[in-house]
Amino acid sequence: MCKDFFIDTYQVILAKSFGADCILIILSAIDKMLANDLNISTLIEVHSENEAETALYFEKSLIGINNRNLKTLEISLNTSVKLSKILNSHRNPLICESGIYSAENIKFIVKNANIHNFLIGESLLKSHDIGSKLKDFAEINL
């Protein structure tokens, strides 16, 4: 997966040429994308109710709910809870993004948003023992 701030369709072509089979699209940053024409999967990232409603038009895409407000950088897991209610009719998996630091965070999202997929980056990268942290996440009993 290629995660970048896609602002031009050329970047989609470039990602595909480098072997990406999926790109992450921040819905607030784009109007239209070339991904479908290139047969590349898309992960549509949303943070607001309006973006969530728009994302439902991307029927073949995965949808990620970013708990981090990209304007203020504040994180709230309640974003996933709130937006999952709008997105519950989407036929593909939803992904909870940002703000996952512990088993309790994951259990909260599963219980309150019924999301079972997570994009975890920061808490792994900031961990002093990435392997141990990853093992802790993998062993969560839901």
Residue ranges and their predicted role:
Residues 1, 21-24, 39-43, 61-64, ...:
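Structural preference for beta-strand elements that scaffold enzyme active sites
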Residues 1-26, 33-42, 50:
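Extended hydrophobic secondary-structure segments
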Residues 2-4, 27, 44-46, 67, ...:
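A cross-domain feature marking catalytic cores of carbohydrate-active enzymes
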Residues 4-5, 45-48, 73-79:
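A general structural motif
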Residues 7-19, 47-59, 90-120, 132-137:
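Catalytic cores of alpha/beta
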Residues 12-32, 64-73, 113-134:
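Glycine-rich phosphate-binding active-site loops on the catalytic face of alpha/beta enzymes
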Residues 56-85:
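Glycine/Thr-rich beta-alpha phosphate-binding loop at enzyme active sites
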Residues 77-87, 124-142:
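C-terminal helical cap(s) of enzyme catalytic domains, especially alpha/beta-barrels
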